[in-house]
Amino acid sequence: MSYLDSIGAVIAVHPVKPSALPKGVNREIPIPAMEFFMDTTRTFTNMVMNDIFSRFPNIKWIFPHAGAFLSILSDRMSGFSMQFRDSLSTKAPFDFKGDMRHVYFDAAGFAAEKQLKNLLGDVNSENIVYGSDAPYTPDPACIAQTGALENIDYMDETDKENMFTLNAVRLVPRLGEILNIKTLGSTVCYSENELSAKDKANRNFRKMVSKVYNAVFTVKNKKDRKEIEKKVYALK
């Protein structure tokens, strides 16, 4: 962990099938529908209780599905923060919401209507990155969920630019180098090779960056990643 902190690693956290499930409980409910949220919430809370975010402040963490139940439980967990410490501890109470602001959350998994709005009560748009859960989520569902995120009425264009493009470049600066994007605060500065005004107006560029970012994070084979990078370079 110390080494990952020293290089400012980007770590994406995602649940898998739980190692144990009570027999006969939730038998007819798909595991991703509910258990993934339980595990994500529990994992983040355990990391808070072990001071992971303060001990390793340079690691960039990404938690999935708009933080699962974190935004629902944040007030409650903050209220219990004193009880998480040993009675003899000289350390300050846990800062649950502060730790939420230290990480990134992807917007995958039907988050647009309610969940992301709740999360934005604890963090801001610079903590949100686009996510689709591809390739495990079928393409039609990915497209529908992306459209829902594009049409959110409680996020302005600056917020959406952060979610779809700028935060990805901040997390993976190599993307900015490949695509000729530089981030200055909450604005995008295009190079001399910039896209036409029409392309910028209809946000095709933003959508393309989102797809590339998601593809890079879901491809494990290095050879395939190289092929993706070649295609990205060709876009210039």
Residue ranges, per PLM feature:
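Catalytic pocket-lining loop regions of alpha/beta-barrel enzymes
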Residues: 1-129, 189, 194-207, 213-216
